[in-house]
Amino acid sequence: MRHMPTITEVMTAFPVHVEESTPLAEALDLMKEHQCHHLPVMGGKQVVGLLSGEDIKLAQSPGHEDQDFEELVAGDLCRRRFAKVDLHTRLDIVLTGMGEEGLNAVIVMKNEKLAGILTTHDACRFFSRWLKKEYLPDDDPGIA
């Protein structure tokens, strides 16, 4: 029987995160610096929200109700309703749930503490590696 990959093999462990009071411009700079699209938002030691690059882009768009982008902080725009899963949840269950709910990220918790984040980007990278391993010979010149 083959091994079911665990969420820990796919997720981004110890993700970059921000406090609720972090200015959006700073959050956007962190996303660029770390090449990520989602940031867990913390209120002390608790995850209180999830901020995405799309949320920030929307706030920067003309006609957005919050016109003064420079005054906004992560807590103003983060989604307060977000999916979180336990570190020991099977990967297939998490991915199925993400697909059914149309989620592009879930927060991964261990003992009520932030342990990681699993995004569609993480899943695609993992699946790509798996496909190459399963279906391409080791001597394939197309493998980088």
Segment roles from a protein language model:
Residues 1-14, 52-84, 88-99, 114, ...:
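Tandem CBS (Bateman) regulatory domains
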Residues 31-34, 39-55, 98, 106-122:
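A glycine-centered beta-loop-beta connector
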